[in-house]
Amino acid sequence: KAHADRFRINKEQIGVMGESAGGYLTCMAALDNDPALDVGEYLEESSKVQAACPWYPPTDLSAFPCESAEKCASSAESLLLGFNSMLNKEKAYQSSPVSKVTKDAPPFLIIHGNCDQVVPYVQSETLYGLLEKKRL
């Protein structure tokens, strides 16, 4: 946003998008507005975005199916988090986009195929339901 004039963009109309783990980051960028996360340069600029388009995002890292704690330790969601999500479900939930949804969330366009073999379709349905509920 600090370079908006240079790139001729409107810094008040910033959207983010990403696929899979990038979809997770898209959701977190759009939903987690904790000021403690604002570090580095350009702190005078807001990190808030005005739109999000996640593609097949993991949205509740505590809800992924795992057969055992041993198998879950090497799962994509545990590797993303840096800890075994099955052994610490509350921490996994708090690290998930679904725990960050508020009435102030920007507009979302969620794209997800219902035959996805990696990220269950219900992950997007859950986020969509929470976004709709908070907007009412």
Protein language model features and the residues they cover:
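Alpha/beta-hydrolase superfamily serine-hydrolase fold, recognizing
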Residues: 1-136
